[in-house]
């Protein structure tokens, strides 16, 4: 389990593609780099991945099954990704905890500003929307958010403008795709 609180933003430095697998090399901020080693399990844009290699400040992950079910298939060199290292045993997680099991990809429908908040309207795939209600939590690119409202297949989340600096949420625009982790039918992550 993860807290759903982004610890830093990495930048895609290299993508190697094979038939069924991609290896992503991500430049890590120093403060997070010091807490990872080979076999560390962590979230990259909300998706649980395992470190396979570290060279300098570049951390490598193999992406296989997640290529077709996440935004990894569209990432390019230079893109920013949210990073979170799994908390230690016994850490408090809070009610917005994430598993790293991405349920689908959603599309940003609209973004508006209100004082110090950004309101992001996200079009959720039909197979996921039926299990979502306002005031639930949802993971968007690894950031745990409360849902303010649900209207048809559109949800609205709010986040403070400072999160647009400390996460990759600031790069979102209408049409952007995001990884989504939702509650399942039994209301568990």
Curated annotation (Swiss-Prot):
Keywords annotated in UniProt: Luminescence, Repeat
Entries under SUPFAM superfamilies matching the protein: Riboflavin synthase domain-like (SSF63380)
Free-text comment on the cofactor: Binds 1 6,7-dimethyl-8-(1'-D-ribityl)lumazine non-covalently.
One Gene Ontology molecular-function label: riboflavin synthase activity
One Pfam family recorded for the sequence: Lum_binding
Function per UniProt: Antenna protein that modulates the color of the bioluminescence emission of the luciferase. In the presence of LumP, luciferase emission is shifted to higher energy values (shorter wavelength).
Full protein name: Lumazine protein
């Amino acid at each position: 389990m993860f807290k759903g609180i982004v610890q830093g933003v990495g930048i895609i430095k290299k993508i190697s593609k094979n038939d069924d697998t991609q290896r992503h090399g991500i430049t890590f901020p120093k403060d997070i780099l010091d807490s990872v080693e080979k076999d560390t399990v962590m979230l990259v844009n909300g998706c649980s991945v395992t470190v396979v290699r570290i060279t300098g400040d570049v951390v490598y992950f193999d992406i296989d099954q997640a290529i077709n079910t996440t935004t990894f298939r569209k990432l390019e060199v230079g893109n920013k990704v949210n990073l979170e290292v799994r908390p230690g045993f016994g850490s408090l997680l809070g009610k917005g905890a994430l598993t790293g099991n991405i349920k689908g990809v959603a599309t940003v429908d609209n973004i508006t500003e209100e004082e110090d908040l950004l309101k992001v309207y996200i079009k959720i795939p039909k197979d996921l929307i039926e299990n979502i209600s306002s005031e639930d939590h949802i993971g968007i690119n690894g950031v745990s958010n409360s849902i303010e409202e649900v209207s048809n297949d559109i949800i609205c989340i709010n986040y403070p403008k400072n999160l647009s600096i400390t996460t990759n949420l600031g790069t979102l625009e209408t049409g952007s795709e995001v990884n989504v982790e939702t509650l399942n039918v039994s209301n568990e992550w």
